[in-house]
Amino acid sequence: GASPMTAGGTAAITLTDGSITYKLGDAGHLSTAEKTSGGPMAGIQDAEASVDSFNGFSVGLGVGPGTLTVALDMHAGTTATVLGENSAGSDIATGCGGQITGFGFNFAGDVGADLSFTYGSGSTTISAAGCTGDNATNAWGYSVMGLGVAVPVGGMTIAFDFGTKASLHTVGTAEGGSATAGWELSLVMPVGDASAGVNLSSTAAITTTGGVAGDAAVTGGTELWYTVPIGPVSLSAGYGSAAVVDGSTTTEIGAEMSMSF
């Protein structure tokens, strides 16, 4: 039989007539717009729209060669979270409570290339009851953007992703926050019954504390992989590397096996 929903439980409702889709509740309302591919190893520096599932409302409808989705996120809380993404470094500004409002949209379609673009932003209205004294002037805002493009060339697929996000806050009179930008480029090609791929990526992040911006932390990633089917089993071998500009490097070599029926 049916069980009642427990405290903290979530649900989602989806309604569609084939041309317009409405979503209400805890769902993946917006795409990360990621189109690149990766292998089994670590090393890739993700470049995408930093959004996730959230309890909100969205409408998706056909526009030209693709689909446009518009989403709204409205909730009260004490964490710097909007459109499903938490900016933990800015929780200090929202800890006394407030009303958070976020808006975002995504367009995905075939425009001669497989394209997806997501943009979103959000901010908090600080609680007058909970945020008193120095906290009465607290503020926080978030913005995010992601672009993904994939192009088939013969049997190969070339894909490119670009993403940025910024979380800025004020606590009393002190400003802080973080900003990140990155890109990914991948190429996947058939090799007989197998496939091979390469992914190159880079991210740069800047953190601001007390109104003073720090140096950019830049990390470059490389991943190579080869995947071959062996009956119902797929075997992948790869190499991954993540190098920071200060000279530290993390390297990983390994293999992964998966089975499908």
Question: Predicted segment positions?
Answer:
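Outer-membrane beta-barrel proteins
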Residues: 1-261
